[in-house]
UniProtKB/Swiss-Prot annotation:
Disulfide bonds: none annotated. GO terms for cellular component: cytosol. It comes from Methylococcus capsulatus (strain ATCC 33009 / NCIMB 11132 / Bath). InterPro entries: AlgH-like. This is UPF0301 protein MCA2336 2. Pfam families: DUF179 (PF02622). Belongs to the UPF0301 (AlgH) family. The lineage of its organism: Bacteria, Pseudomonadati, Pseudomonadota, Gammaproteobacteria, Methylococcales. It comes from the Bacteria.
Length: 188
C-alpha cells in the first residue's frame, strides 16, 4: 500500500462465502484502524449471550436506565476477548477513544460505561468483547485471497439493522447479493 487513501479504516469487511474460519464465517467487521503496521476491527453481527447489565454488574457500575441493560454484548473478535470495546455515535471523545469517522468512534475506557450507567452515554452504541486483528500485510493478503469483500461503512448497518441482517445489508451497500456468491475463488 503506497498511500493512506488505500487503507480501509471506516470500511466494512464482509466475509465471503468461502471464509470458513468459525470466528469469521458470515461476519461483518468494521475496520477501526488500518495502517502499514496492520489493522484492528470489531465484528458487528455476532451477539453473545451476555447483556450490558452483565458487564455493568461485573464492573460494579450502576445502571440507572434499566432498558439499556438488555442491550446485547457482541463477540468483537478472537483477540483479547476479555477487553471491552464500544462503537458509538456520535464520535464523542472519552479517556481512551479512537475516532473512526466524523460520526463514529471506538472507546475502551471505563468512563463511557459510567456515563451510560448515569443515562448520559452515547445516543447509539455497540458493546463488544474482543477484536479482530491483522499484522502487517495480513489483511491485504486475505483480501487478495478472496476472503473478504470490502465496502464503505454505514452507521445504519451497525445501529439500525438487526444483527442477523447485517451481513446481507453490508454487501448490499456495494450492490452484491451475497447469497449468489460462490465459495470458489477465481484465481486460476
Amino acid at each position: 500500500m503506497n498511500s493512506e487513501a488505500e487503507f480501509l479504516a471506516n470500511h466494512f469487511l464482509i466475509a465471503m462465502p468461502g471464509l470458513t474460519d468459525p470466528h469469521f464465517a458470515k461476519t461483518v467487521t468494521l475496520v477501526c484502524q488500518h495502517n502499514a503496521d496492520g489493522a484492528l476491527g470489531i465484528i458487528i453481527n455476532r451477539p453473545s449471550e451476555l447483556k450490558l447489565s452483565d458487564i455493568m454488574r461485573q464492573m460494579e457500575i450502576d445502571l440507572k436506565v434499566a432498558e439499556l441493560g438488555d442491550l446485547p454484548v457482541f463477540f468483537g473478535g478472537p483477540v483479547h476477548p476479555e477487553r471491552g470495546f464500544i462503537l458509538h455515535e456520535p464520535a464523542t471523545v472519552w479517556a481512551s477513544t479512537l475516532v473512526v469517522s466524523e460520526r463514529l468512534a471506538l472507546t475502551t475506557s471505563r468512563d463511557i460505561l459510567e456515563a451510560v450507567g448515569r443515562g448520559e452515554g452515547p445516543r447509539r452504541m455497540l458493546l463488544a468483547l474482543g477484536y479482530a486483528g491483522w499484522g502487517q500485510g495480513q489483511l491485504e493478503r486475505e483480501i487478495i485471497d478472496n476472503s473478504w469483500l470490502n465496502a464503505p461503512s454505514d452507521n445504519a448497518v451497525i445501529f439500525e439493522h438487526p444483527p442477523g441482517r447485517r451481513w446481507k445489508a453490508a454487501a448490499d451497500l456495494v450492490g452484491v447479493d451475497i447469497s449468489l456468491l460462490t465459495s470458489q475463488a477465481g484465481h486460476g
